[in-house]
Amino acid sequence: MGGFLSHLTPEQNVEALKASCGPVRGNIYKHDDVIVDGYLGIPYAKPPVGELRFKKPVTVDVWTEIKDCYKYGPACVQTGGFEQIAGPRTPTPEEAGCLTLNVFTPRNASSEFKNGRPVMVYIHGGGYELCASSDFCAYSLSGTLPLKDVVVVSINYRLGVFGFLTTGDNVCPGNFGLWDQTLALKWVQKHISSFGGDPNCVTVFGQSAGGASTDLLSLSPHSRDLFQRFIPISGTAHCDFAIRASENQAKIFREFAEFHGFSGRDSSALFKWYQEQSPETLSNVKGYKKSISGFLTFIPNLDGDFFPKPLDELRKEAPKKQMMTGVTEYEGLMLASMNPAFSPADVGLTLMPQGIYGKDVVSNPDEIQKIFYEKYVEGVDKSDELAMRKKLCEALGDEFFNVGVIQAAKNAAKHGNEVYFYTFEYVNPDSFGMWDGMMPFKAAVHCTELRYLLGEGVYSKFEPTEEDRKVMETTTTLFSNFAKYGNPNGKGATAEIWEKYSLNRPERHYRISYPKCEMRDVYHEGRIQFLEKIDGDSDKYQELVYGKKKSAKI
């Protein structure tokens, strides 16, 4: 909706940087006595069209002519039902030139990092179907993390059908969006030194589907050696929306093709049909309803290639990394407010488990759905709509985000990774813009932290108060400290305020807020244990994470 520095216009640099990818010219972003150079729309892969459509990305050739990198590249083709949140896409989405990335690098030499600054690579969210790196005002982004002595890279990757088509077999294993992200990380390894970054000190961070992508990248043998630290924000590989079994995802794509008129039988015919369709057809989901359970439609799958083993085995064998992960206080608040199907709240609390716990997930869906509903309405006056809406918000946040994030923290710690766990609980009550009147109460919601991390308001233009600026300073310091030192407390911290995550106290976490940040012992009022029990016994979760099935019986 608008960054806090979106009213400023950068100066275009006439001098070219002789980068190893090819010469580039970028923008000059001025912040008092600090200059940040920004290079927008740098191609990292050949256009994924023609014979390269629905294929793994191919590295772009080094160029010799100066490339003007003054503007973001086009967004990848958008799909899905979140347009009311994401708003109109700028620039216009397209297939041809969408695989680009952006680099923001402080101009002056670092006094601390002689071999190049630490690098932070951001992966945007949007349900694997929407959004782009261009959603973040470049001037605003340049005024956040890059002022903390790090180089920031943001990327585009293929979305929806174009990013995640699979036939469930060798004809089209899929996961092209994840292969795109991996190729972008390889670009960083090869070329970031030209931009003042250290390829041996890379942190990947992402939010929502970008957070799930970040965690998935830390597991795959194709990507996990390309970075040292990672920050999955409000999304991990363990979240409900992160990944599906290949046969279930293939069923969705067959159903979607049949919805648009496909009548073939085998995978080759299905793949050929997809190759022949226009972007307009493949991005049109209006009227389509999937038969497979889950919040999102076109998502990664456990393909046997990018993910050759179940997630727990991959986590166990992956090189040990430092992980920082967390959620906002009320992840589900905006989801509940924006979806008219969830009103009144009692209807929402009935429909929600029906969409999540189907026969493809648990063997006793009716029983699980009933238990889920009764757990969240326990002790609540059903005639009190405000109290019921709060429970709906809790249920949405717990199911889609809160349980998956703490499960990832536990799983990572179990396998020897150093973890820092947090909740983000600060909110400016005037930050919701047009959605203000739809909110039953105000709290930090899904995407709230992006205002303070990247300078961009998702629900309204970010016009920071003095208090907002203090929260931004705290947030960017914590995240950049982790990227630089592997410790959000900073270099050589002796009296650590933010403790490392411990399996002995699994709910203990760091609360980021204002005026005080502090460690807390209870995570979301202890509600998560109930959902962990369901997930621990569900066929879907057990198959994806552990490679085995176990029917849920509570």
Curated annotation (Swiss-Prot):
Chief subcellular location: cytoplasm
Cell compartments where the protein resides: Cytoplasm; Cell membrane
UniProt cross-references to PROSITE patterns, sorted A to Z: CARBOXYLESTERASE_B_1, CARBOXYLESTERASE_B_2
Lipid addition sites, N-myristoyl glycine: 2
SUPFAM superfamilies: alpha/beta-Hydrolases
Gene3D superfamilies, per database record: alpha/beta hydrolase (3.40.50.1820)
Cystine residue pairs: 76-98
Signal peptide: none
One GO molecular-function entry: carboxylesterase activity
Catalytic activity: a carboxylic ester + H2O = an alcohol + a carboxylate + H(+)
Enzyme nomenclature, EC number: 3.1.1.1
CDD domains: Esterase_lipase
Sections of the chain in a coiled coil: none
Topology term for the membrane: Lipid-anchor
Recorded family membership: Belongs to the type-B carboxylesterase/lipase family.
Protein name in the entry: Esterase cest-33
Upper classification of the organism: Eukaryota, Metazoa, Ecdysozoa, Nematoda, Chromadorea
Gene name as annotated: cest-33
